[in-house]
Structures are given as C-alpha cells and as structure tokens.
Amino acid sequence: SIVPFGRIAIPILPDSSVNEVTNILEHSESKVIFVSQKLASKVSKECRDRMTLVIDIDTFEVLQSDDEKFTCDGRTSIPTPDDIATIIYTSGTTGSAKGVVLSHRNLASNVITCYHSCKRTEKDRWLSVLPMAHTLEMTLCMLYPMYCGATVYYLPKPPVASLLMKALKMVKPTTMLTVPLIIEKVYKGSVLPTIQKSRTLTWMNKNMNGLMCRIIGMKLKATFGGHMSFYGIGGAKLDPEVESFLLKAKFPYAIGYGLTETSPLLGYSMHNWRTVGSFGYPVYNVKLKLHNVNPETGEGEIIAKGPNVMLGYYKDPARTKSVFTEDGWFRTSDIAVQDEKGRYFIKGRNNNMILGPSGENIYPEEIENVINNLEGVSESIVVEREGKLVAHVQPNENFVQW
C-alpha cells in the first residue's frame, strides 16, 4: 500500500534475529516500522526510539510516535519507474547482508514477464507458502496475482506438514510457487515409500513412464487439492530423482531460475521443453549468455541483461560495480553449460567451486544432491578440508533410530 505513493518498502524475514533486524533498520535508515505484537520484541529499544512511527501490523494501531498528535496528512509523491520501490536484504552465499535495491520498473517488468511466460487469470486460486520478504514470493505470488485479478490465500505461519495439508484441502489451489524442499519432502514422505512397497519396483525404476507412475502422479496431484494446473519451483536446484518422477508422472510443474537481484525471474522451463536438471531458456524481455566459457568443459558464468536487473546494492557502490561487466551485464556467479538446444544446466556457484587435485572443477552442489537423495538423509553440505572433500550430513529424524 505504501509503494505506489513513493514510499520504500523494506521487508524483514520473521525468523531474523534481533541483531539482524537491528542491522537492517540501521543500515536502511528506516523511519516507520510495521510489526506484529508477536515479533515486537525483535525490535530493540534503541531502534524503536529512532523511529518516527511504530504501527501494529495486525490492528494498525499506532504503538509509538514521536508526536502524540501524529496524523496522516495524505501527502503523496507519485514515483517514477526508476525510483526505488523496495530494498531486499539478503546474505546470499557470501555471508554479509546486502541491501538489493529494486525499482518500480524492475518489479513491473518482471510481472509482465510472468504474464508472457505463464498466463494466469482471475479464476486462479494461489496458495502462498513462502515468506513475503523473498522476491520470489513478493513478485510472483503477490504482485503477479494482483495483476491477473486472481485470489491469493496466505498461511498464517510457516507451512508445517499438518497446516499445509489442511490448507491444500480447503483452498484446492490451481497455482503454487515453492522452493524444492516442499515437493522433495512430499516425494520422500509419500511417493517414495509407495514406490518402494510396490512389487514392480525394479520395473518402475527402468520405466518410470509406466501406468503405476501415472497413478502415483494422480495421487500426488490429489494431495495438492486436485486442481493444480501450475506448480512453480525455484530458489534452489530440484533433486534430479524428484524431477524425473514429476516429469514422467505428468505433474504440472515448472522450473524457474532467478535471483533477488533480478526481481527475481531470469529463466524458466515448462510444458514439453522441460528436461531434468535444466531451467530451460531466458524468460520474455531478458537476455542470458555464458561469460568466460571454458573451451574444454563448455562451462561459463551466467550473465544477464534486462529491465528487471537491480539498481545496485544500497550504500555499496564498490560491490555493485563488482557484479556488473564493463558493458553492463549482471554477473550471477552461477556456473552453467548449454546443450545443443540452448537449454541451461547449472553446475554450481562460482564462489563454491573447489579445485580438485588434478585441476578439475568440483561443484559441491552436485555431490550434495546425490547425498541428499540417500535414505535417512535430510540435508548435507560438502566442503574441502586439508585437500579432501568432507560431507556434513543431517539425518532425517523420522528415519534414524537413536
């Protein structure tokens, strides 16, 4: 509600620590804060004292003001397309928080991109399960449905299994956008045990396009309310085994690729041109190409250009300069290859790459995908230690017996 009137929105994740909240409020020089009573304790007294206004986001009651007679005088400032709309703080993969500055043009162009890539209508029902502080959720699950006139249902708290199942049954959504973790948990918790109990396990592994696979896929669709026509997955790489099942079960999924810095969508894969492990092609109005390509492996860094690319990092011109090429392309730090059809396959993050003893490039993400697919593993991280690769594994609590 504030952005159309020239104000700047700075969302903060609800699970942020007191220090993280303090750092964001101080770095952004915020003057007004909307906060629930439940999370008010995360705003330090020092921060509250610097605020012009503190408002209860649930009741819109003024909790604190530097003027007891404070009133809204209705003054507005109509923004231009290149004015700042929002600053999204993200730690990314390098640790230190970055304030990603996105303009009205950045967000609006990505909404139009979504419409050209996947048309939704006022008849669609969206179920929102991700934090609104993510650009994926803000652009694709709030602004885009508004543009389409669709209805969005929001969960009151993080989507634990029981809450999500109840919401799916009630809403019967036609559209959802999630991170891979949600569909991977459903696959490991419901689909995989069904496959493993089947006497046709060996046959199915070799022929996952068989009748049994289709039947399980229909049951999976029913789990999501029975009306799903578009299930978007983004934010991280999807487990290849899970994607292979979704593809052969004819589940209506699509893979999206992007970053906070690009508002976020850059590429997508859906319908008949989906293939396991690829995010497909650039979306409408966006250009992608590989930079500094290794002639032996074909690997290069994905760089992007389009109206959705951020203005820069807030108060950090040096970091901003470092992520753009001399001719203005944004450097994603994602290393990828392209196949003969031009589809992109991400290998890993440039900053995460480990140089092997024979000079080969090792991407921890590829090893982690294999480990995470093992029975009893919840998640893992692979690092280099004294010249050797070491995997830290978190067991699945439902599987491991202590």
Kindly give the residue locations of the regions a language model identified.
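Structural core segment of the AMP-binding/adenylate-forming
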Residues: 4-65, 72, 378, 387, ...
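Conserved AMP-binding A3 loop
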Residues: 85-111
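AMP-binding/adenylate-forming catalytic core of the ANL superfamily
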Residues: 16, 33, 306, 311-312, ...
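Conserved AMP-binding/adenylate-forming
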Residues: 212-344, 350-353, 368, 378
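ANL superfamily adenylate-forming
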Residues: 40-81, 190-219
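A short helix-loop-beta submotif of the ANL/AMP-binding
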Residues: 1-10, 14-18, 26-32, 124-125, ...
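Conserved pre-ATP/AMP-binding loop-to-beta segment of ANL
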Residues: 70-89, 96, 119-125
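Conserved AMP-binding/adenylation subdomain of ANL enzymes
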Residues: 108-125, 132-218, 227, 252
